[in-house]
Each structure stands twice: as C-alpha cells, then as structure tokens.
Amino acid sequence: MNIGIVGTGSIAHTMAKEFARPTTMPVVAVCSRNADTGIAMAHEFNIPISKVYTEYDEMLADSEVELVYIATPNSLHFEQAKAALLAGKHVLCEKPIVPTVAQLDELLSLAEERHLHLLEAITTIDHPNYGLAKLFAKEIGDIKTVSCTFCQYSSRYDAFMNGQTPPVFDPAYCGGALMDLNIYNIYFVVGIFGDPKAVHYYPNRHANGIDTSGILILEYPNFVCQCTATKDSSAHNSAQIIGTEGSILIEPGSNNCQKLVVTRKGKEPYISEISDTPWRYEVIGISNFLIVPQDTVKERRIRAMRSAVAVLEAARKDAHLDF
C-alpha cells in the first residue's frame, strides 16, 4: 500500500526508515509546508521530486497515494485525518491520534462508511514482548500494583526554558508530557487491563499551562496504576506489573518493550530480549493488518485506541488542562 507522509520531523524520518525496509508499504510522496525539508526527505528516501508537495490537498489528490501517514503536531491530526478519509485514503496517524473521544468517533464513523482503515501509530501494541506481557499477566496471581515510567528530557526543553515555544510545549498544539509520553503508558495499561474506573492526573505546569511532567493515576477495581511521564527530566524507565504470584518487568519502558523479565513463584525467571527497533514491529504489525485485515485485530486496535483517548481526555479534565 503506497504511503504519502505529511510532516518531516524526527518521527517521520524514523518511520520512513522502517517503511524503506522490505515491506508492502513504500513511501511514494511527502508533504511539507517547507519545500526544502520536503525535498531533503525525498532525496533521503528516494521519493521523486515531483511527489514533494507543499499543499496537503494536492497530495490527497495524488491517485498513487493509498494511505496517508500523519506525523504533524497533535492539534492538526483530526482535520488532516478527516480530509484524508474524505479523499478516500486510509489513515495511519501518529499518537495521540486525536484529543477527544468525540473526534475519534467521528473519524471512525467516516472510515467505516467509506470502507477505509483508521490506525494509530504507536510502538507498544505490536511489540512481541508486550504480547507476552499480556499473556503472563494472567499467570502472576491477583494484580496488586502497576507502575509505568517514561521520563525523557526533551531535546526542545532548553529552548522552551529560553523563551521559545516549540509545538511539544504549546497548549495550542496539544503538547505536553501527558499527550506526548504518558500515552505509551496508557496504551500499555489499558491494552492489558481495559478501561479504568477512575482517572486522576497531577501535572507539573509551566506558566503557559502546559504539563512538562506529571503523574497519572488509573484506578481499577482491585489495584491502582501509576503512570509517570516527564519531558523536563530523565530517569530509568520501566513498566512493572506486580501480582500475588509473581511480577512482570519491562525495560526500557512502555514505548520500547525490549526486555521482558517474568518471575513466578516456584519457577525459573522467564526472560525475553529483543534488539530490533520498536518501530520495526509497529510497521510489521500495521503492514500485516493491511494485507489481511482481520476483524478481531481491527476491533482490538479500535478498542485500545478509544480507551487511550478516553483516558487522555479524562486526565486533562481532571487536571483542568484546557486543550
């Protein structure tokens, strides 16, 4: 399925490298507001210069483009995804796909009406070790606590502290630690345990209102989950599920389930280490789904997507983040 990419930031380049591996998803076009960055990306990934667009509508009119990969600031996702679906294109949108459940439901309805696929690009759900974690979570007894940490000092934080406002720290672009990083922790948790019964978010705010870091609490009937994400500091990242009969440890965190360690009473530890990039498995999972779109896989993806967006929306409401 031929891909047109909108956006030329770091994640667009990362995904383009994965698409460039032998897959069924070649990149045939790129759209950037800046022609120079679009041309540079075209040269890097052997995209014809004639397929470099500075107007999104022009790329959507390109009949060779079958799927649009959206890698732009969060606040642009809804309108760009809607336009792509209306143009008859499948959509793969970077996380978080949209800020609200209402927007997501509108896009899902539109995709269903037009027999198109709407997918969210996130590394967690297609990683083999995450699949193992879901299975082993049933073997460690009653769950008592869950904790996920994704702390990553942003490459744009110093500029932000010096008076600039990059999109990742701009409320107008739906930036911040919750939307950018805690989304991985949310996906990790809801994909295993389903919807929480209550959501609370405790952010550290900058003067402009953005959350540069924060702790998200997800309450389940029999346990509480803590999800920590920071863009203003760094730490050792991991995801841990602790039960009465054992525990599951994922490192280096919910966005990259590279190492899985399972300990169970009376059994030898189970360890799985995977060296390939998490984006590799993301692209493989998406590619396999598009080749053979099974209803059960589609339903699971939609359920996880909707649960994650619902948590994001509830967390922002709880913390009075007005975007």
Predicted region positions:
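Beta-loop-alpha module in the N-terminal Rossmann-like domain of NAD(P)-dependent dehydrogenases
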Residues: S50-L108
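Predominantly a Rossmann-like dinucleotide-binding segment in NAD(P)-dependent oxidoreductases
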Residues: H127-K197
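N-terminal Rossmann-like dinucleotide-binding module
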Residues: M1-N46, L290, L321
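Rossmann-fold dehydrogenase core element
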Residues: E106-T124, D142-T145
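Hydrophobic residues in well-ordered beta-strands that form the structural core
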Residues: C93-E94, L118-E120, I250
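Contiguous beta-strand/loop segments that form the cofactor/metal-binding neighborhood of enzyme cores
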Residues: N185-N255, I284-P293
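Short, conserved SAM-binding/catalytic segment
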Residues: A40-I49, E106-E113
